[in-house]
Design a protein with these regions (language model features):
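Short linear motifs at protein or domain termini
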Residues: 1-87
Length: 87
């Protein structure tokens, strides 16, 4: 599974509720197809650094995406968030 370059993928979250701001950056990339089914998001730690927010805030944004069926998450060494795609 291909992992997009994490350097320019997202910008720091600075407005609204931080988890919503993160969600609002990831969601359109999934809907537009920029992030394709099978792509992996960077690990939580990297996402937290990119968005300049804590891991729990990132986790909440990922939970919102998961509830919509856009990503799957797993724990452990082969875990992380994987794009499911748009149904």
């Amino acid at each position: 599974m291909e992992q997009p370059s994490s350097k320019a993928l997202f910008t720091p979250a600075k407005t609204q509720r931080a988890s919503e701001a993160i969600y609002n950056q990831i969601y359109p990339k999934i809907i537009s197809g920029e992030l394709r089914p099978g792509d992996r998001l960077p690990p939580e730690r990297e996402l937290a650094e990119m968005f300049q927010r804590s891991r729990p805030v990132v986790r909440e944004a990922l939970r919102m995406l998961q509830q919509e069926g856009l990503i799957e998450t797993a724990v452990g060494s082969s875990g992380g968030a994987v794009i499911r795609g748009v149904s």
